[in-house]
């Protein structure tokens, strides 16, 4: 019964065309960006037409896919990186840049949205793992290949790093050569910390070791007393006493115990034993407080795990609600509701034609349903015009 009240068709769909004044390369770039937006509604625009970020969570691990479009895109392939660095067969050795064949073989006719979707599908099929000892952020010490220096990462949750020198090298400090090789076997190399702010101007501490003190495996040393080349007290002994000392070990040991150097060693040993016992008693006194703090850390870690799980569930719920309230979803609901109102009005008209309804009841109910139908159609057309207008300026609804 739509012939009773013909509906006017909106001509707003023509407004979605490409804006004038753009070259074919720029139009292709906009089409690829639109493909990326349409394929992934949760993508965030960091810098218009330059940088985009897509977060996703897998196995309680949240990963940000950063998509950087070079100036000559799509003639140049995009630079796709992830943070934090991960281990996966589609990533490079550092776990930062995507080396997928779809990215390496990118052409201006490729579909960027499908490339990112295939990357996500591969991550879901073969979940990645965090890269070990990943302290450096992408682009910290060197520019990636194929990326111009004009673009910045602009991550809001990290402090900005100052520009690094291109020829900067990271060297490790070594202790003095007098340290035995056994000491180095018990030490592990520490990753170089990134320098930023005023900390880069501070001097690094250089460990020093006294070459005159032999060092043991635990890093502590003891300076032995100087042993003289001659013992003047032996000159006061007779030949028979010297002979007895040479032949009898007890006499030699008795004379040896009277040496001041040995007495000094015994005194130092006793002092060291006393200091060790005192330190052990202090450590035992600290045990209850350390155990309490350890339990507190465990409780807070458990609370952190629970809050993280709750946060991820709420983020998933927020994403679902955001999808349900998007412009395309609202437009679909309006279209269905308008169609339902139109069907109800058609049924009322058929009942009237069959004589099942009085004319007064027909006019009131039929006009009410048709008014609702026309209102919903008008809202749908207005929403379509708004979507077409915003799509020209690349602003996602």
UniProtKB/Swiss-Prot annotation:
Membrane topology classification: Peripheral membrane protein
Subcellular location: Late endosome membrane; Nucleus
Main location: membrane
Expressing tissues: Widely expressed. Examined tissues include heart, brain, placenta, liver, skeletal muscle, kidney and pancreas. More abundant in liver. Strongly decreased or undetected in hepatomas.
Protein known as: Vacuolar protein sorting-associated protein 37A
Domain (VPS37 C-terminal) ranges: 308-397
Name of the encoding gene: VPS37A
Residues recorded with modification Phosphoserine: 18
